[in-house]
Amino acid sequence: MNFRCSSAPLAELGCDGVALGLFSSSWQQQLAALLPAMAAQLQPLLEQREFKAKGGEKHSFSFPGQQPSLVIISGLGEPDSFDGLALRKAAASLALASRGSNLKALALGLPIEAFAPDQALTALMQGCRLALYKDERFRSENKPSLDPGEIVLQGLASELDQQLAQQEAICQGVMLARELVAAPPNVVNALSLESTARSIADQFGCELTVLDEAACRERGMGAYLAVAQGASIPPRFLHLVIRPQGPVKRKLALVGKGLTFDSGGYNLKVGGSQIELMKFDMGGCGAVLGAARTLAELKLEGLEIHVISAATENMVSAEAIYPGAIVTASNGKTIEINNTDAEGRLTLADALVYACGLEPDAIVDLATLTGACVIALGDEIAGYWSPDDGLAQQLNDAAHRAGEGLWRMPLQSSYKDGLKSGLADMKNTGPRPGGSITAALFLKEFVKPEIPWAHIDIAGPVWSDKGRSTDPSGATGYGVRTLVEWCQAVAADAKEGLSQG
């Protein structure tokens, strides 16, 4: 699928399909201005269907033998509520409405006058591209795509075409994350994630370090290896480095939880626990590898990025870790494992210690960590915790620009009492109330206090049963866009600071 920008009127684009978004207060005037030659045909048809241009209202009309032969019209509601996220959703909705029409080209006409050109371009292209994503890898027959061959983003100057490659790189990162998370655990495991990381390194000239079990043991990664010891597939600790072409001004670490399947261990997941979906427990790893694929292509000036994941499975076997076992993490802290189904934080513990050893300017980890976060925020919003207000604001702003839901949660220090152990430095779980908070407090024990750090719990938005806006059902690729936006902002700030002296 190709994209291009054009400031020419819709009627002059020569597309066989046109998709419009109209505001409820002025839809007749907008229709006449956008498609003057067809307005007299379309307005009576819309009135017959009692079209009010309410948000989400959508109608399609076929005109065989005419140009365009298909017109799709969507209501946008009132203009005062039409923000960047609404623009992204409108583009996605109109693109999906064209699916199956086998158009050569679809002209997309949405009101973008209130947006900066680059903001509009991002929302329109990502909205369309990601909504039309379809995973056909595991079907016996691949049906031919009937999606538009080209989508023309009307109202944007053709000079903006040079930015389309950057947007395609971001979409490719999201789609890689979706593919990794959606694939079954007999396809994606620690070894295949190593192959994915190596593919990124080879394609874009990055550095990859892979630690096997012996190397992890030499580094004292007892928490990570306690989880891995029950699996028949060997663990792989992945460290991908994306270096800029010039001098390094900032160094960031992205850490992703990489549990390719989570049985719960001896605290086995039972009915209602969605064990059949526990392939998505590596959603954090999927997100950071997806972001790595994008960032490796973009090569942001002055920014060195370290992507880290401790990949393994959490399985039941004769070698699996016992409930009640005490293990030692690589920073020397001892952990009583009172629940083997709280394994992700154990793998992250050693990954965070490793990341701190790189002395980055900031660390962000992503993990499908707790059901408690899903209960609190649902499946559209991730929760995040950070003791650093500056980093927290950066992530909040990045998520807003990316169109991904993110909500800051409290690091209530008194809740740390719930992690007290009578035998070890701490337990790996606390009481059920505030479970996502105690999980974040646990992770905080493995981060040097002088390094800005944030933990993002993506257990809710990593997966969508029914699909939503730009996300088809299944794996969403959540987190990639936010991470890329954050890295871009950090690189821009570093460049601006340098230029100011």
Swiss-Prot record:
The keyword Manganese applies. GO terms for molecular function: manganese ion binding; metalloaminopeptidase activity. Gene3D superfamilies: Leucine Aminopeptidase, subunit E, domain 1, Zn peptidases. It comes from Synechococcus sp. (strain RCC307). Binds 2 manganese ions per subunit. This is Probable cytosol aminopeptidase. It is found in: Cytoplasm. Mn(2+) 1 binds at residues 262, 341, 343. Its EC number is 3.4.11.1, 3.4.11.10. InterPro entries: Leucine_aapep/pepB, Macro_dom-like, Peptidase_M17_C, Peptidase_M17_leu_NH2_pept, Peptidase_M17_N. Signal peptide: none annotated. It holds the Pfam family Peptidase_M17. It is an enzyme of class 3 (hydrolase). Mn(2+) 2 binds at residues 257, 262, 281, 343.
